[in-house]
């Protein structure tokens, strides 16, 4: 591309100004002196190549290129441009420099330490290099995700992180204009902060979930304010303080005019008042709907019709607000792959103090994703949201499994009338074919394959329907959701008034999914090496020697890939080649045994202990005989949010001695 002379001279002038501003010449002189002093022998001459290497090593060239990109970007932005898409990234532990768009407004949020985390009052100072429990702070604001560096758990955790949050309007015409104070005052999205604790074994715990109202900074002098945030516990401890964070908020570029604190407070009070009124009206309507539902049949009182559910902070919210069409971008390609992703997120019931029934806790999506595990309702809500994003008519079903255990799963309704159940905890799919209990069976009816027994209601982001059929048994239910004699609907307008995006300020916004940060090859290799060591030590304790056969280990890879492919697509492929290769690798008169197993965590020691509980696997690991050769292969398959499926296969071959 050639430039006219006037443009070329203008560009040279811009570059020269930028280099002078950065004092590049001074920095080059310093590095030149340092290189001659420290790296060159007395009789050696410094070449241009050596100097460029030294500049590149110290990051000078990268800094210059970034700054020059910044300048050219600003030149290009003089032309009209379409609104920029929101950025989503997961902040890594290493700090990275960010190019700031001078046409946008930013909120710089700094976390300047914590205090009063009394649960860790007696926590000793970790020794250098010692593995210890850590705190990680996760943030979400308007489609942007951030994660702090992990800090050791302590009474006063050493949080020192800064997060640059872009503040903008998404409506047409406003996307390219810098937001002023009045515009920002109308942006009611809070900053969702989630605190996660990770123990020395890699197990995560949700410590706190907090919605930060940031707009007080708009009424502060110079657009800068400091505040203390008291974090409360979750679930049964939602009224107990877990600690305090010191936070500083700063607008960038600085505001030309700040609003009065009275205007800010009035706006916030008005929003709270509107939200409270909408929620009150919905509650009145829900009570009326429930009375009508009970009048159909008094036995409906015992059905699992869930209109409201408590989140991690103990706040009652309509169940429809936990679901929303969610697009995974390029991270997941198919609905079945989405089901596999949800399946490999860990399953853990909400912790409860003491005995009794199940503790209810439907987590907000950010809390579920950051903790990387949750209850069946969390899995079902996420899977339903993803399936809605793929354009399917999906609903969360609330009912029971065997022995009357409450459960949630997902249902999709096809255009051809097919009803499919999706089990979010396993990724399995079941076609539902209702049986008519009034007709005498010509032949014995086959037992349904799905584990569900009863169903009380179904819902998504727009609809809520209570089951009003004579029986709530799943096998006899007809899923014609338009038939009001079988399914009593709630008003879609009433649901929209409290569950539509932006309907109320108390509605947590949905975060985007983040790509995995796990290197599958490196992690697979690490776990495999750890398992080899554990097997060798275990056999040594039994007085057995261990001989590994690398080729046999390698031959196990296709089987593991085939197992994961089958979980993702429900199609079995590649097994014939694996069996043929094993037959060739095992000589006549020898026996081959293999044991595949699947985990959703990366703790090798924990996986090994689980494997030893299987008699068949123990038989392989503790194999005795002539010419015993052992093999182990690990294959980690990564999914968004650093979730992963870990396949392990232990195998042995030995000469059969009668």
Curated annotation (Swiss-Prot):
One of its GO terms (biological process) is regulation of centriole replication. The modification Phosphoserine is found at residues 74, 82. InterPro entries: CEP76, CEP76-C2, CEP76_C, CEP76_N, CEPT76/DRC7_peptidase-like_dom, Papain-like_cys_pep_sf. Its main location: cytoplasm. It comes from the Eukaryota. GO terms for cellular component: centriole; centrosome; cytoplasm. It is found in: Cytoplasm, Cytoskeleton, Microtubule organizing center, Centrosome; Cytoplasm, Cytoskeleton, Microtubule organizing center, Centrosome, Centriole. Keywords: Cytoplasm, Cytoskeleton, Phosphoprotein. Disulfide bonds: none annotated. The keyword Phosphoprotein applies. Interacts with CCP110 and CEP97. Belongs to the CEP76 family. Centrosomal protein involved in regulation of centriole duplication. Required to limit centriole duplication to once per cell cycle by preventing centriole reduplication. This is Centrosomal protein of 76 kDa. It comes from Pongo abelii. The gene is CEP76.
